[in-house]
A protein has these predicted regions:
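Gly/Thr-rich phosphate-binding beta-strand-loop-beta motif of the actin/hexokinase/Hsp70
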Residues: 1-21, 138-163
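Adenine-nucleotide phosphate-binding core of ATP-dependent small-molecule kinases
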Residues: 190-235
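Glycine-rich phosphate-binding loops at beta-strand->alpha-helix junctions
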Residues: 231-249
Length: 290
């Protein structure tokens, strides 16, 4: 049995591919490795793929026992700090169960160097989404994950080309890029940069009747930007907002759009765990270090 663990913005999702469960990040502060018996007896778990925060401290899929500082440069940065993800990671590591840590995409990643104009491109769970989607749609794919924040990735010939991170381009419902007003509030000492990021989504910046339309427009723009680099790529949407924005994104892009549910990342991570622990040396262009 192989398990994928999605460290999402609002919840932790656990999947074996056949069974799954989720807990809030607050509930995750009480997690123990024994909770995995909801998916499988512990002695039948052959491998786990774990995500933690931004994953910017490692460039490769790495044995959890070899990862320092949970695979991050710092816990500071853009996002909520609750403690649930830390608890899950530490419990898995202490359990002795075979596990690998999935990296995020950053300047140390083997992506198109032009994307490295920004320090960070995507957090680790997005790799799970891309892996799951590529199984269905092939080796040339654009995937936009639209929920609390919006992140879009491009796969070309089976290798990750690059991604637009949550704080760079399209807003999500809660989080987004910092605009001039946000920068001014920060400079006046009225807000931290992280708090500004956490309140830059459409739920904070747009009237209710324009929120879905706005997210759809920006999601389509991110996808269109990626299609400049790979015009023949298939397009998919994931995340909690995917069903709501899909019709408009399809209309704006004039192409078919495949929609995935909230379990896409965890299922893809379970698939990564299976492939890594059965001998894969490369996942979407990311090396595997055992």
């Amino acid at each position: 049995m192989f398990i994928g663990i999605d460290h999402g913005t609002t919840a932790m999702r656990f999947s074996s591919g056949d069974a799954e469960f989720k807990i809030s990040r607050e509930e995750a502060r009480q997690f123990s490795a024994g909770d995995l018996t909801r998916l499988s007896p512990l002695d039948e778990i052959e491998g786990i793929a774990v995500c933690y925060s931004m994953g910017d401290g490692i460039p490769a899929i790495t044995d959890i026992r070899k990862v320092l500082d949970r695979g991050v440069v710092s816990r500071e940065g853009a996002g909520k700090h609750i403690g649930g993800g830390t608890r899950v990671y530490d419990e898995i590591r202490a359990s002795g169960l075979p596990a690998v840590v999935i990296p995020g995409l950053h300047r140390g990643s083997p992506t198109d160097p032009r994307f490295k104009a920004y320090s960070h491109q995507a957090s680790p769970e997005k790799i799970g989404i891309l892996y799951e989607v590529s199984r269905d749609l092939g080796d040339d794919v654009v995937v936009c994950d639209a929920s609390s924040n919006t992140v879009t990735l491009l796969l070309t010939a089976g290798r990750i080309t690059g991604a637009f991170d949550a704080c760079v381009f399209a807003p999500g419902t809660q989080h987004g890029a910092l605009d001039v007003d946000a920068i001014r509030r920060i400079d006046r000492g009225e807000s931290t940069a992280n708090d500004a990021f956490l309140h830059a989504g459409v739920d904070h910046t747009m009237p209710p009747d324009l929120r879905v339309e706005t997210m759809a427009m920006f999601a389509a723009m991110e996808c269109a930007s990626m299609l400049l680099l790979n015009p023949g790529a298939n397009v998919a949407l994931a995340g909690s907002m995917a069903p709501a924005i899909a019709p408009r994104v399809k209309e704006l892009l004039s192409c078919d759009v495949t929609v995935y549910d909230e379990w896409c990342a965890a299922r893809g991570l379970a698939r990564i765990a299976r492939d890594v622990f059965t001998g894969a040396t490369d996942i979407l262009g990311l090396a595997v270090e055992r």
